[in-house]
């Protein structure tokens, strides 16, 4: 069995296809999925998915592409991590692959 360690099945373009995606995962021996948040305002959507699907887990954080969004503080991340379906912190860090220019923010 395999685990998809980084997916975004909460994105709007998959709203009508989540069941199909999860069936395809199972058919391809992917037993679990880690749905990674890109902004904290979407975490509740992801947590809803983790409640609906026993094989979906969550990662909480803010993707570095969203430098204009308030970064979460440690306490906020810690509070989310108390949920048994939150098993990772991320998106985080600096995305040197996509971002250009001054990265001092």
Residue ranges and their predicted role:
Residues 1-105:
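Mid-domain alpha/beta scaffold segments of enzyme catalytic cores
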